[in-house]
Amino acid sequence: LLTSASFRNSLMVTLIFVVIVVAGSMILGLIAAVLCNKAIPGIRFFSTSYALPMAIASSSAAMIFKIILNPTIGILNKVTGLGINWIADPKYALVCVAVLTAWLNSGINFLYFSAGLANIDDSIYERASVDGASGVQQFFSLTLPGLSPIMFYTLVVNIIGAFQSFGQVKLLTQGGPGESTNLIVYSIYRDAFFNYR
């Protein structure tokens, strides 16, 4: 198994995919949760709409992304004027699938981080402000340590979820172009149902 070039490629592609998905979805979820933790008018509407990706099936989201990334009628190429075939280009295909997966996972991460932020006592921020700590210092010295149990849990759940990503790859790229998006789970599927191994 380890001598197979296809398997080694699939393993490398999967590891890159997992890193992009986990980092992207956790950062997006954390930023949204920190922003929604402030008392800003209309924040409830934003938080509700941000959590909506959880309710979208990965197959539906993949089809929406396929339309957005279409080289001729896709909105991304219309807005940027780049004319790139995002899904058919090996340089961009894995990133496109990873961005879709990170976006889908960011909604649940947002809820986890929001719950964690609600458990951090506001008085420690007030004391830190009185002591002269800036917002950035408060974030790194108070918020992140306060969220560390939630962050560990979210990290583990996101890693497991990223390794299980199948629908997006099947609908967007089918492991291609070449084997640029051939994740391990898709490789297993292809070997089991098409190569009969």
Predicted regions located by residue number:
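A structural signal for multi-pass alpha-helical bundles of membrane permease subunits
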Residues: L1-R197
